[in-house]
């Protein structure tokens, strides 16, 4: 018995035109190729909300590792700003969030910073800073001060020179900023037991007495001259010459002591 006799012709699908042959002559033949079933795995796509994921991570536990896909702001931390002056639809009412009347409801730049309604503002009620706190030149230091105690503890030997450079080398002073251009001044705190040669821009009165008593040689370095106009310098020279002559005449007119 053949395979064609097992399948009735009536069970064959009806073929529509344009087939022009005899349908009864068609014979169904078994397929020699095995049927292959291919299973395709569907990719699942999930949409994650950042804010919700951050909230879930916080509530799930502390052992959850933070990643780029679960980072987000905390719920309620980011609020939408008020849209003032954009009509009733912005949710601020008919006055659009500016109130009824007044200077703050008008157009323009508004009031100045620090304005308190006409009374004396706080930044004018407080006293002004004077001296070095206010940055005035009169309150700034004019010298790098060094006491006799610092020179004694620096380890200088007899006959050595004490100056701004040697004090820097021994790390007694470490001026910075504008202090690097200032001259040296010796103050009288402490005692000095060695005979030294001290070069400084100024000496205090008591320090000068102590150093002369200890046998030290003092050298006053010339200060930095301030620039003045030539006409002003000429007038200053004339005034100095005039007062020098006047002082000389007064000393000559004084009677000699008996």
Curated annotation (Swiss-Prot):
Please report the name of this protein according to its UniProt entry.
Large ribosomal subunit protein uL15c
**What species does this protein belong to?**
Pisum sativum (Garden pea)
Q: Which gene encodes it?
A: RPL15
MF terms per GO, please?
Answer: mRNA binding; structural constituent of ribosome
What Gene3D superfamilies has UniProt attached to this entry?
3.100.10.10
- Keywords for this entry? Chloroplast, Plastid, Ribonucleoprotein, Ribosomal protein, Transit peptide
Can you state the subunit structure given in the record? Part of the 50S ribosomal subunit.
Q: Which family does it belong to?
A: Belongs to the universal ribosomal protein uL15 family.
Instruction: Output the Gene Ontology cellular-component terms.
Output: chloroplast; cytosolic large ribosomal subunit
Q: Where found, per UniProt?
A: Plastid, Chloroplast
Chain intervals with Basic residues compositional bias? 77-86
Single GO BP term:
translation
The UniProt annotation puts the region (Disordered) at 67-90
